[in-house]
């Protein structure tokens, strides 16, 4: 990962190296966080952030599904995203807003655990590699089944929901594939 200089954390910009959280963070133990993955691209009119209002809306919707009360409004988060790109002098970037529970009570009910928000932006080329567009990619069907949409809100981008995809990706790469397609369970099919 190509680190940038600054990360927005709980309302202020801090040096990348200083953007740390406790190993006792509820999210680290239980996967109770949400995020977005947003792209900024250099264009004829300058840097543009793809569908920023839609991404911010989904971040807030995902947070609501996980009972994370974001301590900032949408305008503050939108500006933090824009400023993260600008202050890091990025014309093209990957932007990762993350909402997560900090340190506090353990257990499945984080009722008095503080909610933190971070926004990181960095230079990240093509997701499947710079040659993928020209050379194509090798894709396999994973032995891991996609998590049922009845298990959690399928439109929420929850950090815990990506463990399934991580297992499948590790397996795919281990046998020389570039990417994967998870099996659909019967209840995922229309």
Question: Model features per residue range: what roles?
Answer:
Residues 1-72, 79-83, 106-184:
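Helix-start/capping segments and mature chain N-termini
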Residues 69-74, 86-98, 128-129:
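Short secondary-structure capping/junction motifs at helix and strand boundaries
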Residues 100-105:
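Short, internal active-site loops enriched in acidic
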């Amino acid at each position: 990962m190509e680190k940038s200089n600054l990360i927005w954390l709980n309302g202020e910009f801090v040096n990348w190296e200083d953007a740390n959280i406790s190993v006792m963070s509820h999210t680290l133990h239980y996967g109770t966080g949400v995020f977005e993955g947003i792209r900024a691209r250099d264009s004829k009119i300058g840097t543009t952030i793809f569908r920023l209002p839609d991404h911010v809306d989904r971040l807030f919707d995902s947070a609501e599904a996980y009972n994370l009360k974001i301590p900032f409004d949408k305008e503050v988060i939108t500006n933090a995203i824009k400023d993260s790109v600008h202050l890091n002098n990025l014309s093209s970037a990957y932007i990762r807003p993350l909402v997560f529970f900090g340190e506090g009570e353990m257990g499945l009910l984080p009722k008095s655990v503080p909610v933190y928000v971070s926004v990181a932006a960095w230079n990240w080329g093509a997701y499947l590699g710079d040659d993928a567009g020209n050379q194509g990619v090798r894709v396999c069907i994973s032995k891991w089944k996609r998590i049922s949409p009845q298990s959690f809100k399928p439109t929420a981008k929850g950090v815990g929901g990506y463990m399934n995809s991580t297992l499948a990706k590790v397996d795919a790469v281990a046998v020389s594939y570039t990417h994967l397609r998870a099996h659909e369970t019967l209840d995922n099919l229309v």
